[in-house]
Amino acid sequence: AAPAAKAVASGECEKGIVLCTTGIGVSISANKVDGIRCALLSDVWSAKMTRLHNDTNVMALGAGVVGENLALEIADTWLGTEFSGDERHQRRIDKLMALEK
């Protein structure tokens, strides 16, 4: 997870997807990298909302938790949803990013 998160944080790529059996370990690992907002996802609605409201740049999936078809639907939704740009959502992100300092 760390190499993917570092690639996103450095600007080498825009977004990253990380997987392990539960998704928990990779999400914790990715979130240790400054500039990363990783969400562990197991449903389509959360995939959409985490992009709209939190501008997540890494998503984690548990391969032993979600089946292949659902995982693909979650990834498609997450990749296809843009950040809302709403001021209240940006303030929330700014507060989260300030915790890294």
List each language-model region with its residue ranges.
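Buried hydrophobic packing segments
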Residues: 4, 26-29, 75
